[in-house]
A protein has these predicted regions:
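Pocket-flanking alpha-helical
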Residues: 84, 106-110, 243-245
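N-terminal glycine/serine-rich phosphate-binding loop of ATP-dependent small-molecule kinases
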Residues: 1-94, 122, 222-232, 419-421
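Active-site core segments that coordinate phosphate-bearing ligands/cofactors
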Residues: 2, 7, 19, 112-124, ...
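Short beta-strand-loop/turn "lid" adjacent to the catalytic site in phosphate-handling enzymes
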Residues: 62, 66-98, 127-133, 158, ...
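Carbohydrate-associated surface elements
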Residues: 101
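Short, well-ordered amphipathic alpha-helical segments that serve as non-catalytic structural scaffolds
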Residues: 52-65, 186-192, 380-387
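Short glycine-rich phosphate-binding loop at a beta-alpha junction
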Residues: 70-78, 153-154, 206, 391-403
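Glycine-rich beta-strand-to-loop/alpha-helix junction loops that act as flexible
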Residues: 77-81, 210-211, 259-262, 398-406
Length: 486
């Protein structure tokens, strides 16, 4: 009997539910519903509408139930670091802050006045970023946030949604790891860091790893959806963790680039890599599936283009890519990770002002802006990959690009040109596939990640890009390093 696995995949700009089924040695994915996920600005702060997300999940479940399809289990993955405060009565205390809220500007330095940067990094191995949950929690504590002061439990986004479905509170390993609250060696919540932000382990749900059962749908949810007591399985709750599980690699000599709103570039390791070099380069050691560590760097990704598109009206990606392809190469370059691009009111204006401030030609038309973004991302990928090579325990012979960005032919070719090794693109639905994979492993329908990767490699169309014009890109890389602000 075939088993259907219901995957909830929520990103920072959109979400969807997907029904995954294994058929004849392959995997079939069917999108059930797709919906936007927007920042909500109120009173100078940015929030996520978790009730809307919950409602969209219920809509997806109702659609499957209406068709008479059975569901073996449900798994939820989301973006990282954001969380919900839950009161002693079990109610959510307010909508969760979004990680792009400006209240965490300067937050790391405030915490480091009490516990050193080196100690925080040494315990967690996590890249220092303003919006990490550790710094969000410390900011709320310092600001006497009423929700945090009244909170009995802190639930990260995937865990909050599974709680709303099941009534069970858990803390899933991969999402807690990226929060900068997990000790990289013990793979458990780190008491000293929790104490530093006024919390303890009792403020979090039962600690679980990918593949463990959270609970079953509450009677209320069963009544609303028309479904039975379906189990909810903890997948890799951090979407990157689920995506990397689905990299279609046949050996371990690869790096991955999970390409979406964020670009996350890294390698898999068997143990954390925490030393002076990784700290200086600000690399992160995030928890993965089957005991692996994802040694990676967060890079600003398609956020740059997504925000530009807000002011460009109804434009398609193929249209923008075509315009960029027709423009002069290397006219303008930016550092995609410059703070000025974190959440500007006008992204195109931020890019042009950056180019002007660094003495470059200013993009004058839309295609030039897009080309600037793509070339800058490709060159930034090269910069990060060079650092990654020095840290990786294995040689890097191929870059696997997964996620929505894997459909961008122009950026993929630029990336191959810049890094000088083959780029293998696909699957674009890596996060949903990884989510389904982990559920299937929990159900006994799949054995291990290595076997699942081989199945994906056989059954999902992939495209390989060979490096071209490498001498031109080598020269551009020198220019990139000289002209961009660090």
């Amino acid at each position: 009997m075939k088993q259907n696995f219901f995957a909830v995949d929520l990103g920072a700009t959109s979400g969807r539910t997907i029904l995954g089924t294994f058929i004849e040695g392959g995997l079939n994915l069917e999108e059930i519903n797709r919906f936007p996920n927007h920042l909500v600005e109120v009173g100078g702060h940015f929030y996520w509408d978790i009730y809307a997300l919950y409602s969209h999940i219920l809509d997806g479940l109702k659609l499957v139930a209406h068709r008479g399809e059975s569901i073996a289990s449900i798994g939820i993955d989301t973006w990282g670091v954001d969380f919900v405060c839950v009161g002693k009565d079990g109610n959510l205390l307010r909508q969760p802050y979004a990680y792009r809220d400006p209240h965490t500007v300067g937050a790391p330095e405030a915490l480091f006045s009490r516990i050193s940067r080196s100690k925080v990094y040494g315990k967690t191995g996590i890249q220092i970023m303003n919006f990490n949950s550790l710094f969000q929690l410390d900011t709320l504590r310092r600001n006497h946030d009423s929700a945090l002061e009244a909170a009995d439990k802190i639930l990260f986004m995937p865990d909050a949604l599974s709680y709303m479905l099941t009534g069970e509170m858990v803390t899933e390993y991969t999402i807690a790891s990226t929060a900068q609250l997990v000790n990289a060696q013990t793979r458990r919540l780190e008491p000293e860091l929790l104490k530093a932000v006024g919390l303890s382990e009792k403020n979090f749900g039962r600690f679980v790893f990918p593949g463990e059962k959270v609970g079953v749908l509450t009677e209320e949810v069963q009544k609303i959806t028309g479904l039975g007591a379906i189990p909810v399985i903890a997948v890799a709750g951090h979407d990157t963790g689920s995506a990397v599980a689905a990299v279609p690699a046949l050996d371990r000599n690869f790096a991955y680039l999970s390409s979406g709103t964020w670009s996350l570039m890294g390698v898999e390791t068997d143990a954390p890599v925490i030393n002076a070099e990784t700290e200086a380069l600000n690399f992160t050691n995030e928890g993965g599936v089957e005991g692996t560590i994802r040694l990676l760097k967060n890079i600003c990704g398609m956020w740059l283009l997504e925000r530009c598109r807000l002011n460009w009206g109804d434009t398609s990606y193929p249209e923008l890519i075509s315009e960029a392809d027709a423009c002069e190469p290397f006219r303008s370059l930016i550092n995609p990770d410059d703070d000025c691009f974190a959440n500007p009111a006008d992204m195109e204006k931020a890019i042009t002002e950056y180019c002007r401030a660094t003495g470059q030609s200013v993009p004058e038309k839309r295609g030039q802006v897009v080309r600037c973004i793509f070339e800058s991302l490709a060159l930034r990928y090269r910069q990060v990959l060079e650092n990654l090579r020095s840290l990786s325990p294995r040689p890097i012979e191929t870059l696997h690009v997964i996620g929505g960005g894997s459909r961008n032919d122009l950026l993929n070719q630029f990336t191959a040109n810049a890094i000088g090794i083959p780029v293998v693109a696909g699957p674009s639905e890596a996060t949903a596939i990884g989510n389904v994979m982990i559920q299937a492993m929990a159900a006994g329908e799949a054995t291990d990640v290595a076997g699942m990767r081989q199945l994906i490699n056989r059954s999902i169309p992939l495209k390989t890009y060979q490096p071209q014009d490498t001498e031109v890109w080598d020269a551009a890389y020198i220019h990139f390093k000289n002209c961009v602000r660090k």
